[in-house]
Amino acid sequence: MTDLIVVGAGLYGLTMAERCASQYGLKVTVLDRRSHIGGNAFSEFDPETGIEIHKYGAHIFHTSNERVWEYVNQFTQFTDYVHRVYTTHRGEVFPMPINLGTINQFFRAAMGPDAARDLGGASPSNLDEQGVSLIGRPLYDAFIRGYTAKQWQTDPKDLPASIISRLPVRFDYNNRYFNDTYEGLPKDGYTAWCENMANHPNISVQLDTDFFDVSQPLNRDSVVGSVPVVYTGPVDRFFDFEFGELGWRTLDFVRETVDTADFQGIPVMNYADESVPFTRIHEFKHFHPERTYDSGVIVREFSRFAQGGDEPYYPVGTVQDREKLLQYRQRAAAQDGVHFGGRLGTYQYLDMHMAIASALTNVPGVAEMAAR
């Protein structure tokens, strides 16, 4: 007998399951259609090289939320890794995010902060204008426009200005990618961290289990209304795409083993030029300099619109998407005994710490739902 079913073994679902099991004594069953836990944070050790690979793209944990940091440290220790990214433009490598070092290297100048700020422009109405207003046309065209066009397969003039809001621009020489108080990578890997979260006598995990497969007993049609559910899958799928499918971007990864101790000297190298088909190359060994390897693994990352069967990564959020989402949110709010959460369940981009923080906030409400 189970008190709560959690659909999705990503960080939102696992946080919800662990708290409900350990703090409220609920017996929780976690379902995931994949063959592993951890959601998109899942990592695996390459059998040929022993290098830890982030299967769904680079994941770096960072947060300034004390509550989240205290919580995650119950399940893993973190390295002192600090993320730094570089970008290649026309055969030259520049530090990212855009900072005084990037600006002065690009212009072959020695600008101070005030002079660099003066490169910007007027108030923006779309992503193209937002980028220019932040850093001026030359820098925007070099580092943002082509990269964004590859990411979204859309002219930046047709994208909302909000998409670029996550891109920091600094008028000093700080090239640390994140500014959060805490940052690092789980010492034993993301999968070990997630397994520790699920390691509780009140938690049962069932992998390779599709919540919508009526041939397995814990399917949507049989449990909704009978057992409380935390649902972290796509919200449109839960309602059988009643109002249409929501738009997502997906990623393709091409993995290659390289017979060299160091391919690019950095974990992540972006490629800003539209003439290069991929957006970046990951070299995962550099995430853990405390580990030693003789060879390497690189992964090229490509971005495109998601189609049926693809893994959804980033919500597109067009006007049509937002109209559909409003309808799905109304249906979700009226769905008794089901809590919708996480990146897919709420149709929003969430960093790892944000997903965990959201789950921690919502645990009491879910526990109350399960007690009815």
Stretches found by the model and what they are:
Residues 42-55, 61-113, 167-173:
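A conserved beta-strand/loop capping segment in the N-terminal third of enzymes
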Residues 227, 236-371:
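C-terminal segments that line or cap access tunnels to active or ligand-binding sites in enzymes
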Residues 87-227:
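Active-site/ligand-binding neighborhood in enzyme catalytic cores
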Residues 15:
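Short alpha-helical segment within the catalytic ATP-binding CA
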Residues 29, 204-208, 339:
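General small-molecule cofactor/ligand-binding pocket signal
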Residues 1-12, 29:
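Beta1/beta-strand and adjacent pyrophosphate-binding region of the FAD-binding site
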Residues 18-47:
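Glycine-rich FAD pyrophosphate-binding loop
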Residues 5-7, 31, 223-236:
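Short hydrophobic core segments
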